[in-house]
């Protein structure tokens, strides 16, 4: 019961006051399966990209962290090819930093910061980490290329996904709405902050 009421509050807050460049919504109307989008930050190799994440909420939430992974491929030392994310806030102590006082919004913001500032000393992808440390121009070039190939919206406001199936005709529409929401949220924040 605590999990459901907490998730409802968090989703209301994420809808009313999302972090800049972030949007989050229920997947198929299920409260324990969410999707989020993060807009790549300015002056990063991910700039202009919209990255979709899958979020699974465990039964023991908030005493156990949400499971998050990127659905959009991203070239990053702390994110592997399956989309898994190496971030302390997604792990329980003693190895991690998850606490029940953290929430989905906080973790999404932490992921956004990790995208802007990779941690090459705690990598999931050793080869990308080495590139980041010793050949940063090559890392930046590859990360920009991956962003252009996988995360840049081909049609204005549309995020292409592998989830488009005849059974789920509304998926494209909801992704279009959320992609615009994340981008509009970022643009609104820029206007307010300037």
From Swiss-Prot:
Catalytic activity as recorded in UniProt: S-ubiquitinyl-[E1 ubiquitin-activating enzyme]-L-cysteine + [E2 ubiquitin-conjugating enzyme]-L-cysteine = [E1 ubiquitin-activating enzyme]-L-cysteine + S-ubiquitinyl-[E2 ubiquitin-conjugating enzyme]-L-cysteine
InterPro entries: Ub_conjugating_enzyme, UBQ-conjugat_E2_core, UBQ-conjugating_AS, UBQ-conjugating_enzyme/RWD
Region of interest: Disordered: 158-194
Pathway(s) where this gene product acts: Protein modification; protein ubiquitination
A Pfam family matched in the record: UQ_con
GO BP annotation list: DNA damage response; DNA repair; protein autoubiquitination; protein monoubiquitination; protein polyubiquitination
Compositional bias annotation for Basic and acidic residues: 158-170, 185-194
Domain UBC core: residue ranges: 2-152
Compartment annotation: Nucleus
Keywords annotated in UniProt: ATP-binding, DNA damage, DNA repair, Nucleotide-binding, Nucleus, Transferase, Ubl conjugation pathway
EC numbers for this chain: 2.3.2.23
Active site positions, chain numbering: 86 (glycyl thioester intermediate)
Enzyme class, first EC level, given as a word: transferase
Molecular function in Gene Ontology: ATP binding; chromatin binding; ubiquitin conjugating enzyme activity; ubiquitin-protein transferase activity
Cellular component GO terms, alphabetical: nucleus
Bilayer-crossing regions: none
Family indicated by similarity: Belongs to the ubiquitin-conjugating enzyme family.
Function: Accepts ubiquitin from the E1 complex and catalyzes its covalent attachment to other proteins. Catalyzes monoubiquitination. Involved in DNA repair.
Name under which the protein is recorded: Ubiquitin-conjugating enzyme E2 T
Organism this protein belongs to: Danio rerio
Name of the gene encoding the protein in the UniProt record: ube2t
């Amino acid at each position: 019961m605590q999990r459901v009421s907490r998730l409802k509050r968090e989703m209301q807050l994420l809808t009313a006051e999302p972090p800049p460049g972030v949007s989050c919504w229920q997947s198929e109307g299920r409260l324990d399966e969410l999707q989020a989008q993060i807009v790549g930050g300015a002056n990063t190799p991910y700039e202009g990209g919209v990255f979709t994440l899958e979020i699974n909420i465990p039964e023991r939430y908030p005493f156990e962290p949400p499971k998050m992974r990127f659905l959009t491929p991203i070239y990053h030392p702390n994110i592997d090819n399956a989309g898994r994310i190496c971030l302390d806030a997604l792990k329980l102590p003693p190895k991690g930093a998850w606490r029940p006082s953290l929430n989905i919004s906080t973790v999404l913001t932490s992921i956004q910061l990790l995208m802007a500032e990779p941690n090459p000393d705690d990598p999931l992808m050793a080869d990308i980490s080495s590139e980041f440390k010793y050949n940063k121009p090559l890392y930046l070039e590859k990360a920009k290329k991956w962003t252009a190939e996988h995360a840049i919206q081909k049609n204005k406001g549309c995020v292409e996904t592998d989830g488009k199936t005849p059974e789920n005709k509304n998926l494209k529409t909801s992704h279009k709405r959320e992609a615009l929401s994340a981008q509009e949220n970022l643009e609104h924040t820029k206007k307010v902050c300037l």
